[in-house]
Swiss-Prot record:
Recorded metabolic or biological pathway in which this protein acts: Phospholipid metabolism
Domain notes: The HXXXXD motif is essential for acyltransferase activity and may constitute the binding site for the phosphate moiety of the glycerol-3-phosphate.
Phenotypic effect of disruption: The amount of cis-vaccenoyl group (18:1) linked to the sn-2 position significantly decreases in the deletion mutant. Loss of the gene does not affect cell growth or morphology, but leads to increased fliC expression, enhanced flagellar formation and enhanced swimming motility in the liquid medium.
A molecular-function term among this protein's GO annotations: acyltransferase activity
The UniProt record lists the keyword Lipoprotein: no
Transmembrane segments: 21-43
Periplasmic side: 1-20
A GO-annotated cellular component: plasma membrane
EC number, UniProt record: 2.3.1.51
Known role: Acyltransferase involved in the biosynthesis of membrane phospholipids. It introduces a cis-vaccenoyl group (18:1) into the sn-2 position of phospholipids. Overproduction of YihG facilitates the synthesis of phospholipids containing a myristoyl group (14:0) and a cis-vaccenoyl group at the sn-2 position, and a cis-vaccenoyl group at the sn-1 position. May affect flagellar formation through modulation of the fatty acyl composition of membrane phospholipids.
Protein's recorded name: 1-acylglycerol-3-phosphate O-acyltransferase YihG
Reaction it catalyzes: a 1-acyl-sn-glycero-3-phosphate + an acyl-CoA = a 1,2-diacyl-sn-glycero-3-phosphate + CoA
Length: 310
């Protein structure tokens, strides 16, 4: 009994030390990488010359790669972590990709950055407006031309119809900047992290997912057109740490990450005017919902297999 108690206490102490180390490491890496990116972003703003813009953008992408390497060290603080990754074949840093993914946790961004950093161009995320105010990180993301999306409720849009379509315009402006060099645009199309509360509030018909929001990726496809080489449909989960994967990651208790990558061609019928063409909008939503149904079945299979193993 005493041995079990001592083991429990030591495990808690080790988790607390790992948590502290992880937080300090994350802050230091973020500051070290974001400050040069912010300075470069200011240079890009003051000198909007195409040649300078391209060189500065490449430098910013390099610093983001360094940030991803720092996050990889963070994952190494999880000594029992096992990766199960399927579908990385055929990827290239010379291509343009649209990456869509389910969203379970803050850990998702760390996983995507670390996993894909050597396989595809640097990820550019669709971000919530609130993240713009996070010290260092917000300005760095702005310098990297990541679009900040401001979500409005249906009731708010009814009172302020002039706000309708603002996110779409933000997407269009950001995507125009990605034409000049290979880019991976990442969109968590659920618009928010999955929780049971949000699942009930949105009346989701999916078991493991929130309903997908189609406007952002539809606009990205419309602006960049055939410049996108492929669609990366990514499904990820943390079967052993499903309740709080990000906290478990920081505490060194993350044990298993499962990632399925489905590389798909982008059909011509997915390019169109999502805002004004109701027929296209309906077709696009049906296509995205069908992807989400497949993703939901895959997640159910992964989670049920884990329960059986236990």
């Amino acid at each position: 009994m005493a041995n079990l108690l001592n083991k429990f206490i030591m495990t808690r102490i080790l988790a607390a030390i790992t948590l502290l180390l992880s937080i300090v490491l994350t802050i230091l890496v973020t500051i070290f990488c974001s400050v040069p990116i912010i300075i470069a972003g200011i240079v890009k703003l003051l000198l909007p010359v195409p040649v300078i813009w391209r060189k500065v953008s490449r430098f910013c992408d390099f610093m983001m790669y360094c940030w991803c390497e720092g996050l990889a060290v963070l994952l190494h603080l999880n000594p029992h972590l096992q990766w199960e990754v399927h579908g990385l074949e055929g990827l290239s840093k010379k291509n343009w990709y649209l990456l869509i993914c389910n969203h379970r946790s803050w850990a998702d961004i760390v996983v995507l950055c670390v996993l894909f950093r050597k396989h595809i161009p640097m990820n550019k995320y669709f971000l919530k407006q609130q993240l713009a105010w996070v010290p260092f990180l917000g300005l760095a993301c702005w310098s990297l031309d990541m679009p900040f999306m401001k979500r409005y409720s249906r009731a708010y849009l009814l009172r302020h119809p002039e706000r309708r379509g603002k996110d779409v315009e933000t997407t269009r402006r950001s995507c125009e900047k990605f034409r000049l060099h290979p880019t991976t645009i990442v969109n968590f199309v659920e618009g928010s992290r999955f929780t049971q509360e949000k699942h009930q509030q949105t009346h989701s018909t999916f078991q493991n997912l929130l309903p997908p929001k189609a406007a952002g990726i539809a606009m990205a496809l419309n602006v960049l057109g055939k410049q996108f080489d492929k669609l990366l449909n990514v499904t990820l989960c943390y079967p052993d740490n499903n309740r709080q994967p990000f906290f478990d990651m920081l505490s060194g208790k993350l044990t298993r990450i499962v990632v399925h990558v489905d590389l798909q061609p982008i059909a011509d019928e997915l390019h169109g005017d999502y805002i004004n063409d109701k027929s296209f909008k309906r077709h696009f939503q049906q296509w995205l919902n069908s992807l989400w149904q497949e993703k939901d079945r895959l997640l159910t299979s992964l989670m049920s297999s884990q329960r059986q193993n236990k």
